[in-house]
């Protein structure tokens, strides 16, 4: 039994479906639009993606995306290394920086726990977080996950992970709307959530 060779257009649709919140219909519309109206822009997109794949990697300390060994924040010696904020994704770091409410450092999990999608503890880079804490300067860990089912599950796992470790642990206050992702929260609300963060455990073993 022979199989029809996949054509280039269908291959483009299938490739676009890997993007967040892009299903078959959306992928088809994007493919039509790029090929019919935005061919030059599509070529620039391909070039930019190829360049990023070659040059962008993870920061050796905080796990965010950067070019070179350390991101600008980790390389900044004026930051307060005693406070480490743990966030879901790089966009959360950008939002915190825009809110100007945290002068410490970050660790980016690059994922969150979602059992429905088969994303367990292996999705949140706990091994890299443990390595990051090996430096000994951290005193307080601020859990800055969203107040969604996935964010709460991730926060619970992190709380258990830190339970017997000698760190003060806190979490953002619930000024952030229930079900809200940090990337959609305004700077004022985000700053208030940091300043009024809820203590989970005191420091010390």
From Swiss-Prot:
A zinc finger (C4-type) spans 59-74. The keyword Zinc applies. Keywords: DNA damage, DNA recombination, DNA repair, Metal-binding, Zinc, Zinc-finger. InterPro entries: DNA_Rcmb_RecR (IPR000093), Rcmb_RecR (IPR023627), Rcmb_RecR_Znf (IPR015967), TOPRIM_dom (IPR006171), TOPRIM_RecR (IPR034137). GO terms for molecular function: DNA binding; zinc ion binding. One of its GO terms (biological process) is DNA recombination. Coiled coil: none annotated. Residues 82-177 form the Toprim domain. May play a role in DNA repair. It seems to be involved in an RecBC-independent recombinational process of DNA repair. It may act with RecF and RecO. PANTHER family: RECOMBINATION PROTEIN RECR (PTHR30446:SF0). Belongs to the RecR family. This is Recombination protein RecR. It comes from Neisseria meningitidis serogroup A / serotype 4A (strain DSM 15465 / Z2491).
